[in-house]
Amino acid sequence: MEVAEANSPTEEEEEEEEEGEETISEPRPHTRSNPEGAEDRALGAQASVGSRSEGEGEAATADGGAASVPGAGPKPWQVPASASEVQIRTPRVNCPEKVIICLDLSEEMSVPKLESFNGSRTNALNVSQKMVEMFVRTKHKIDKSHEFALVVVNDDSAWLSGLTSDPRELCSCLYDLETASCSTFNLEGLFSLIQQKTELPVTENVQTIPPPYVVRTILVYSRPPCQPQFSLTEPMKKMFQCPYFFFDIVYIHNGTEEKEEDMSWKDMFAFMGSLDTKGASYKYEVALAGPALELHNCMAKLLAHPLQRPCQTHASYSLLEEDEEAGEEEATV
């Protein structure tokens, strides 16, 4: 008489386990609600879909140092290499913005080199004034709780229009401006002024609690490459590391490089970009001899909310399928 072991499974139990394994491994049918097994593929892809801190753009690069130009030696105005990038995940919400627009008034802004829409030549100041007004009025239509301030930059910075949610108040100060010859660029004074006039919000949990507002500085800058007056103090370092502070740049340059100069416009652009320790700000450069349309395009790209936009290296503005396919081909090479 054969006695079955108490711990050994019976044939019926083995068959049930085999059927269960087949059921788990069997993919869902390709129905209209699940074309080509898209939902099954999405399950595996969800693990790779992350936020800004999980591999988007500059914030998750392995080269966590400050941006520098290849082959260039260390310069005293460069951010120290020890300033590592801060990877922070924040809720992607459309909270109110406090936008501080800093407009350069150096004499280079009055040189008529930009090509306007009708083919004539215009200067960068006129184009910047128009694009700033369009930006402010458009942001106001998106969310009437956004606030705007205007700062003009000469040798020093002046707070021209306080934070206001009325676009007309800022625009009334925008056009009565004159350029001047500037010998230096006091970048440290600009950030000190911003710190005095604004207060960065604080939340109990950065990753889950939306902030009451964010502070964004947009610098429209155009002058020959020069060594800025700047030293990264501890308060400034905290400001740049704050997840609710953003420093966007529109740099208008002459497009040429003089061999006799100590630094080129590329050095200056790289230095300004290196101030962003989170990889969350947007930086654009436009040649002074190019079309004015490029400036308008850059300002239009800055309309996106800084908490909701991707890192700049992941941003795509193409609408045609051809451009999208071309972009995919480039990414797979």
Curated annotation (Swiss-Prot):
GO molecular function, one term: identical protein binding
Main location as per UniProt: cytoplasm
Modified residues (N-acetylmethionine): 1
Gene Ontology, cellular component aspect: BRCA1-A complex; BRISC complex; cytoplasm; cytosol; nuclear body; nucleus
S-S bridge residues: none
Annotated spans, VWFA-like: 99-302
GO aspect biological process, one term: regulation of DNA repair
InterPro entries recorded: BABAM1, vWFA_dom_sf
Compositionally biased tracts (Low complexity): 58-67
UniProt biased composition (Acidic residues): 10-24
Sequence segments annotated as region (Disordered): 1-85
Keywords per UniProt: Acetylation, Cell cycle, Cell division, Chromatin regulator, Cytoplasm, DNA damage, DNA repair, Mitosis, Nucleus, Phosphoprotein, Ubl conjugation pathway
Keyword Cell division on entry: yes
Keyword Cytoplasm: yes
Signal peptide start-end: none
Compartmental location: Cytoplasm; Nucleus
Modified residues (Phosphoserine): 8, 33, 53
Similarity remark: Belongs to the BABAM1 family.
Subunit structure: Component of the ARISC complex, at least composed of UIMC1/RAP80, ABRAXAS1, BRCC3/BRCC36, BABAM2 and BABAM1/NBA1. Component of the BRCA1-A complex, at least composed of BRCA1, BARD1, UIMC1/RAP80, ABRAXAS1, BRCC3/BRCC36, BABAM2 and BABAM1/NBA1. In the BRCA1-A complex, interacts directly with ABRAXAS1 and BABAM2. Component of the BRISC complex, at least composed of ABRAXAS2, BRCC3/BRCC36, BABAM2 and BABAM1/NBA1. Identified in a complex with SHMT2 and the other subunits of the BRISC complex.
Function: Component of the BRCA1-A complex, a complex that specifically recognizes 'Lys-63'-linked ubiquitinated histones H2A and H2AX at DNA lesions sites, leading to target the BRCA1-BARD1 heterodimer to sites of DNA damage at double-strand breaks (DSBs). The BRCA1-A complex also possesses deubiquitinase activity that specifically removes 'Lys-63'-linked ubiquitin on histones H2A and H2AX. In the BRCA1-A complex, it is required for the complex integrity and its localization at DSBs.
Recorded domain comment: The VWFA-like region is similar to the VWFA domain. Its presence reveals similarities between the structure of the 19S proteasome and the BRCA1-A complexes.
This protein's name: BRISC and BRCA1-A complex member 1
Organism (species): Mus musculus (Mouse)
